[in-house]
Amino acid sequence: MLSIRNLQIEYDSKVIVRNLTLQVADGEVVCLRGESGCGKTSILRAVLGYIDYSGTIELDSAVMNERTTAGLRQQIAYVPQEFVMPFDTVDEMIHSVMDLRANSLQPCSKDLLMTAWSQLALDLSLYDKQARELSGGQRQRIMLSIAGMLRKRLLLVDEPTSALDADTTRLVAQYIHRLAHEQHMPVLAVSHSDTFAQQCNNIIDVP
Protein backbone atom coordinates (compact mmCIF):
# COMPACT_ATOMS: atom_id res chain seq x y z
CA MET A 1 0.00 0.00 0.00
CA LEU A 2 1.07 3.55 -0.75
CA SER A 3 0.09 6.07 1.91
CA ILE A 4 0.53 9.85 1.63
CA ARG A 5 -0.38 12.13 4.53
CA ASN A 6 -0.42 15.92 4.65
CA LEU A 7 1.89 16.25 1.66
CA GLN A 8 2.97 19.80 0.90
CA ILE A 9 5.31 20.80 -1.93
CA GLU A 10 6.75 24.26 -2.49
CA TYR A 11 8.54 25.68 -5.51
CA ASP A 12 10.22 29.09 -5.42
CA SER A 13 8.47 29.82 -2.10
CA LYS A 14 5.08 29.07 -3.67
CA VAL A 15 2.96 26.18 -2.38
CA ILE A 16 1.96 24.02 -5.36
CA VAL A 17 0.56 21.04 -3.42
CA ARG A 18 -1.13 21.65 -0.08
CA ASN A 19 -2.03 19.04 2.57
CA LEU A 20 -2.65 16.14 0.17
CA THR A 21 -3.68 12.88 1.84
CA LEU A 22 -4.43 9.66 -0.04
CA GLN A 23 -4.02 5.90 0.03
CA VAL A 24 -3.57 3.46 -2.82
CA ALA A 25 -4.24 -0.14 -1.82
CA ASP A 26 -2.58 -3.16 -3.42
CA GLY A 27 -4.35 -3.94 -6.69
CA GLU A 28 -5.86 -0.46 -6.91
CA VAL A 29 -5.35 2.27 -9.53
CA VAL A 30 -5.76 5.87 -8.33
CA CYS A 31 -5.71 8.79 -10.76
CA LEU A 32 -4.43 12.27 -9.93
CA ARG A 33 -6.41 14.65 -12.13
CA GLY A 34 -6.02 18.39 -12.57
CA GLU A 35 -4.97 21.24 -14.80
CA SER A 36 -1.42 21.57 -16.12
CA GLY A 37 0.91 23.06 -13.54
CA CYS A 38 -1.15 22.07 -10.49
CA GLY A 39 1.59 19.79 -9.13
CA LYS A 40 0.49 16.32 -10.26
CA THR A 41 3.90 15.31 -11.59
CA SER A 42 5.57 16.87 -8.54
CA ILE A 43 3.58 14.44 -6.37
CA LEU A 44 5.08 11.50 -8.27
CA ARG A 45 8.55 13.02 -7.96
CA ALA A 46 8.03 13.44 -4.22
CA VAL A 47 7.13 9.75 -3.91
CA LEU A 48 10.35 8.94 -5.76
CA GLY A 49 12.31 11.18 -3.40
CA TYR A 50 13.49 13.46 -6.20
CA ILE A 51 12.23 16.70 -4.62
CA ASP A 52 11.83 18.11 -1.11
CA TYR A 53 8.45 18.01 0.59
CA SER A 54 6.81 18.05 3.99
CA GLY A 55 4.41 15.39 5.19
CA THR A 56 4.65 11.59 5.28
CA ILE A 57 4.99 9.08 2.44
CA GLU A 58 4.93 5.35 3.22
CA LEU A 59 5.26 2.27 1.02
CA ASP A 60 4.13 -0.91 2.76
CA SER A 61 4.37 0.94 6.11
CA ALA A 62 8.01 1.89 5.49
CA VAL A 63 8.38 5.65 5.88
CA MET A 64 10.34 7.39 3.15
CA ASN A 65 13.11 9.58 4.53
CA GLU A 66 16.76 10.38 3.85
CA ARG A 67 17.81 6.98 5.16
CA THR A 68 15.25 4.80 3.37
CA THR A 69 14.45 6.58 0.10
CA ALA A 70 17.24 5.04 -2.00
CA GLY A 71 16.22 1.50 -1.04
CA LEU A 72 12.50 2.12 -1.44
CA ARG A 73 13.04 3.73 -4.84
CA GLN A 74 14.37 0.38 -6.06
CA GLN A 75 10.89 -1.04 -5.45
CA ILE A 76 9.18 1.55 -7.68
CA ALA A 77 8.62 1.45 -11.45
CA TYR A 78 8.19 4.91 -12.97
CA VAL A 79 6.91 5.70 -16.45
CA PRO A 80 7.36 9.45 -17.09
CA GLN A 81 5.45 11.42 -19.68
CA GLU A 82 8.62 12.49 -21.46
CA PHE A 83 12.08 10.99 -21.33
CA VAL A 84 15.33 11.03 -23.27
CA MET A 85 15.88 8.08 -25.60
CA PRO A 86 19.66 7.42 -25.53
CA PHE A 87 19.17 4.16 -27.43
CA ASP A 88 19.62 3.34 -31.11
CA THR A 89 17.11 0.49 -31.24
CA VAL A 90 14.02 -0.65 -29.36
CA ASP A 91 15.82 -3.91 -28.51
CA GLU A 92 18.66 -1.92 -26.90
CA MET A 93 16.14 0.19 -24.99
CA ILE A 94 14.43 -2.90 -23.56
CA HIS A 95 17.66 -4.58 -22.53
CA SER A 96 19.07 -1.43 -20.96
CA VAL A 97 15.97 -0.72 -18.88
CA MET A 98 15.59 -4.35 -17.80
CA ASP A 99 19.37 -4.60 -17.20
CA LEU A 100 19.69 -7.86 -19.09
CA ARG A 101 23.20 -9.16 -19.81
CA ALA A 102 22.24 -11.67 -22.51
CA ASN A 103 22.33 -10.71 -26.17
CA SER A 104 18.60 -11.27 -26.54
CA LEU A 105 15.56 -11.75 -24.37
CA GLN A 106 14.87 -15.27 -23.21
CA PRO A 107 11.99 -16.80 -25.22
CA CYS A 108 9.60 -16.81 -22.25
CA SER A 109 10.41 -13.17 -21.44
CA LYS A 110 9.99 -12.03 -25.03
CA ASP A 111 6.68 -13.91 -25.27
CA LEU A 112 5.41 -12.07 -22.18
CA LEU A 113 6.58 -8.76 -23.59
CA MET A 114 4.89 -9.38 -26.92
CA THR A 115 1.67 -10.32 -25.11
CA ALA A 116 1.82 -6.99 -23.28
CA TRP A 117 2.40 -5.18 -26.57
CA SER A 118 -0.69 -6.79 -28.06
CA GLN A 119 -2.73 -5.66 -25.06
CA LEU A 120 -1.36 -2.14 -25.50
CA ALA A 121 -2.14 -1.99 -29.25
CA LEU A 122 1.56 -1.92 -30.15
CA ASP A 123 2.60 -3.39 -33.49
CA LEU A 124 5.04 -6.25 -32.85
CA SER A 125 7.21 -5.06 -35.75
CA LEU A 126 8.28 -2.10 -33.57
CA TYR A 127 10.72 -4.43 -31.81
CA ASP A 128 13.13 -4.13 -34.75
CA LYS A 129 12.67 -0.39 -35.27
CA GLN A 130 15.10 2.42 -34.60
CA ALA A 131 14.19 4.21 -31.36
CA ARG A 132 14.07 7.58 -33.13
CA GLU A 133 11.26 6.28 -35.36
CA LEU A 134 8.87 5.82 -32.43
CA SER A 135 6.14 8.29 -31.58
CA GLY A 136 5.82 9.62 -28.04
CA GLY A 137 2.82 7.38 -27.40
CA GLN A 138 4.67 4.30 -28.66
CA ARG A 139 7.72 5.01 -26.48
CA GLN A 140 5.59 5.44 -23.40
CA ARG A 141 3.59 2.26 -24.00
CA ILE A 142 6.80 0.29 -24.54
CA MET A 143 8.10 1.67 -21.23
CA LEU A 144 4.81 0.66 -19.61
CA SER A 145 5.19 -2.90 -20.93
CA ILE A 146 8.73 -3.04 -19.50
CA ALA A 147 7.47 -1.71 -16.15
CA GLY A 148 5.08 -4.64 -16.04
CA MET A 149 7.97 -7.07 -16.57
CA LEU A 150 9.98 -5.55 -13.71
CA ARG A 151 7.36 -6.59 -11.11
CA LYS A 152 8.03 -3.79 -8.64
CA ARG A 153 6.01 -3.01 -5.51
CA LEU A 154 4.61 0.28 -6.82
CA LEU A 155 3.92 1.71 -10.27
CA LEU A 156 3.90 5.45 -10.97
CA VAL A 157 2.66 6.58 -14.38
CA ASP A 158 2.65 10.14 -15.71
CA GLU A 159 0.09 10.95 -18.44
CA PRO A 160 0.18 7.48 -20.07
CA THR A 161 -2.46 8.37 -22.67
CA SER A 162 -1.67 11.99 -23.56
CA ALA A 163 -1.07 11.20 -27.25
CA LEU A 164 -3.69 8.47 -27.68
CA ASP A 165 -7.25 8.24 -28.97
CA ALA A 166 -10.14 7.17 -26.74
CA ASP A 167 -10.09 3.48 -27.75
CA THR A 168 -6.34 3.10 -27.15
CA THR A 169 -6.70 5.05 -23.90
CA ARG A 170 -9.17 2.43 -22.67
CA LEU A 171 -6.78 -0.38 -23.66
CA VAL A 172 -3.95 1.26 -21.70
CA ALA A 173 -6.22 1.73 -18.67
CA GLN A 174 -7.26 -1.93 -18.85
CA TYR A 175 -3.61 -3.03 -19.07
CA ILE A 176 -2.66 -0.95 -16.02
CA HIS A 177 -5.60 -2.41 -14.09
CA ARG A 178 -4.49 -5.90 -15.08
CA LEU A 179 -0.97 -5.23 -13.81
CA ALA A 180 -2.29 -3.86 -10.52
CA HIS A 181 -4.58 -6.85 -9.99
CA GLU A 182 -2.22 -9.63 -11.09
CA GLN A 183 0.82 -8.25 -9.26
CA HIS A 184 -1.12 -7.02 -6.19
CA MET A 185 0.51 -3.65 -6.76
CA PRO A 186 -0.73 -0.13 -6.05
CA VAL A 187 -0.67 2.20 -9.06
CA LEU A 188 -0.67 6.00 -8.85
CA ALA A 189 -1.30 7.62 -12.22
CA VAL A 190 -1.40 11.21 -13.41
CA SER A 191 -3.86 12.05 -16.18
CA HIS A 192 -5.95 14.90 -17.50
CA SER A 193 -7.98 12.41 -19.58
CA ASP A 194 -11.51 11.82 -18.30
CA THR A 195 -11.62 8.62 -20.37
CA PHE A 196 -8.61 7.25 -18.47
CA ALA A 197 -9.70 8.59 -15.08
CA GLN A 198 -13.12 6.96 -15.33
CA GLN A 199 -11.42 3.55 -15.62
CA CYS A 200 -9.59 4.03 -12.29
CA ASN A 201 -10.70 2.86 -8.85
CA ASN A 202 -10.49 6.37 -7.46
CA ILE A 203 -9.93 9.90 -8.73
CA ILE A 204 -8.14 12.57 -6.70
CA ASP A 205 -8.70 16.06 -8.10
CA VAL A 206 -5.61 18.17 -7.49
CA PRO A 207 -6.62 21.87 -7.26
Language-model segments: residues:
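Conserved ABC ATPase "signature" region
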Residues: 108-126
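Q-loop/switch helix immediately C-terminal to the Walker
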Residues: 82, 88-104
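Helix-to-loop junction immediately C-terminal to a conserved catalytic motif
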Residues: 47-48
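Conserved ABC transporter NBD signature motif
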Residues: 52-65, 72
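Conserved ABC ATPase signature
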Residues: 130-134, 138
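Catalytic Walker B motif of ABC-type/P-loop ATPase nucleotide-binding domains
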Residues: 155-159
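The feature captures the beta-strand-to-loop junction immediately N-terminal to the Walker
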Residues: 33-35
